[in-house]
Amino acid sequence: MKKLVFKAMILAFVVIGSISTIGCKKEDGVVTPVTLDETNQQLVDALFSVSNLDLTGYNDSEVYVMNSNDDLWQLVGDMNIIIPEVDFEKYSIVWGYVVVPHTGYVLSSMELSVSNGNYTMNVEIFKGETGFQAITNRVFWGVYPKIEEPISLNVSYIYVIE
């Protein structure tokens, strides 16, 4: 069930990302995600089969930049998964997760920005009214024009006022 929810969330990001365009330079502002239509479902499957990371407990939230198939294999770590061909000469995959203390938290937006050559992934988490107390995580990812620099993660929580 958890995998199904994660896949649905990523599918929503893919659909949102499909209206994006290519052509971002290293200027200050928002970095637009790229959609690779023929590989999206394989990428979703691969990025949600991540087996080399311990995403349980009180781990910090993380963000990774993948610039090669080797990077992608290190993250996925499962030889039974089909890894799509991604042109890593042109693109990078940004993958991350945010640890949340409640199952009702929903990833409401993500935005990669660059300022003075420094990249930041801004993730907004919305706390819905339903759910229960449990340490869990919310996964996010996107395909972007080539990124060589590390990315810092900024997480904002939006709470429902009752």
Segments (PLM) and residue ranges:
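Short, Lys/Arg-enriched, disordered terminal segments
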Residues: M1-A8, E148
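A broad, structure-centric signal for solvent-exposed, well-ordered loop/edge residues
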Residues: A8, W73, I151-N154
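N-terminal processing/targeting junctions
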Residues: G17-I19, Y64, P150-I151
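N-terminal catalytic cores of peptidoglycan-degrading enzymes
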Residues: K25-V86
